[in-house]
Amino acid sequence: MSQIWKIPAPGDIVWYLFPEIPDIKPGPKPRPAIVLSVERREVGDQVSVIYGISRHLMRLKTGEVAITQAKNPAAYALAGLAYDIKFDFKVIVNLPWSDRYFKVPARNPYGNTPKIGTLHATILRAIETAYRAALAR
């Protein structure tokens, strides 16, 4: 598949269909993800993303971080979120940067792209802590 969008940067928040493991077929429900890394390849760009979920926000486990409107309105706004979310750094998947997995949400301020926002500087320490904790497990 040809490249249809600009490649995201680490720290961007994108809209995607979390794959059903182990098949890696796109799941049914779009959700936000943090871009951890990007690998440029001749056969197509690969993106490592961190799983986002809106459930159980009050029970953060090791390797998880939440972005909520009440606790950090600046980070919430810059992330482009429509609802509070937590990201689980224990669930990282590598996916091709294509319209099979990534979708353009309705009313996207960034235009015709899956990017919905980016991480705010005030949340970076919590992000790093969650990432390191997940690696240590």
Where are these regions (language model features)?
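Compact nucleic-acid interaction/catalytic patches
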Residues: 24-30, 35-75
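C-terminal terminal-subdomain/extension
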Residues: 69-137
